[in-house]
């Protein structure tokens, strides 16, 4: 999922009121680096989380995002790189498409973090809708928020748009071992929500490694995990523990089950 890191950063920025803007792609045409639903967070200190192009469009987007935050208003951008004149003039940016962006100042969206948290916990997809008169509404499961913001007088495009961010993919890892920390880090970096199911004391870490840690039997953990995982990995390095997990997993509809074992 490309949404985990921008949304996590946007939640922290909203709570901190640190002058960041969330920029979301609400529509595209032609050849673009991203599709509708892509997003990035632009911070007041020139930090950026997420990409909307190969790097050619971000400087102008960041400039407009800073103005939106400073003015406390919604803004929109319509970036069209399909003009043949750009190719002949040598100013083409490497893609021939159109992006329609909505720019939202996170300081003006109190409670945004609770929606991101509900989405992350599996309450439901995160829907976001912006109307032309500045009403922003968002929902994740039963969590609903609505805000009304002024619209930039200089908005180069209609600010209206809507998108739905699907739930992040979820994986349950049954059994921990020496490779767990690295594997979990990779999965989280790729946007997965990671739960480790492990009862053996020697493998239970003192610090936060996964998004969730279940000190339960595989059967009890699977009964408790909601929503159900999209994938499961069995890797106890122990025959009986692996067998116990596989027996429990055989009763589920999880579409992918992987088993780590000797070659």
Question: PLM features: residue spans?
Answer:
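Short amphipathic alpha-helix with an adjacent loop that forms part of the alpha/beta core around
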Residues: 218-228
């Amino acid at each position: 999922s490309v949404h985990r890191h921008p949304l996590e950063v946007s939640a922290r920025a909203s709570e901190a009121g640190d002058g960041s803007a969330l920029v979301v792609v609400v529509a595209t045409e032609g050849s673009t680096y991203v599709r509708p639903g892509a997003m990035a967070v632009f911070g007041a200190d020139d930090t950026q989380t997420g990409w909307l192009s190969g790097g050619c469009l971000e400087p102008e987007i960041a400039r407009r995002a800073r103005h939106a935050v400073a003015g406390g208003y919604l803004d929109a951008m319509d970036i069209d790189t399909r003009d043949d004149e750009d190719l002949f003039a040598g100013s083409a940016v490497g893609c021939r498409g159109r992006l329609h962006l909505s720019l939202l100042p996170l300081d003006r969206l109190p409670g945004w973090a609770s929606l991101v948290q509900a989405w992350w916990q599996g309450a439901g997809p995160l829907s976001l809708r912006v109307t032309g008169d500045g009403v922003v509404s968002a929902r994740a499961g039963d969590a609903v928020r609505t805000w009304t913001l002024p619209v930039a007088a200089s908005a180069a495009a209609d600010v209206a748009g809507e998108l739905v961010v699907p739930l992040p993919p979820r994986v349950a890892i049954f059994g921990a071992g020496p490779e767990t920390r690295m594997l979990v880090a990779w999965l989280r970096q790729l946007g997965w929500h990671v739960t480790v199911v492990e009862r053996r004391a020697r493998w239970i870490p003192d610090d936060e490694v996964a998004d969730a840690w279940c000190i339960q039997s595989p059967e009890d953990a699977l009964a408790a995990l909601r929503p159900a995982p999209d994938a499961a990995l069995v890797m106890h390095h122990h025959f009986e523990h692996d067998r116990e997990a596989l027996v429990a997993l055989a009763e589920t509809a999880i579409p992918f089950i992987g088993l780590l074992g000797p070659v």
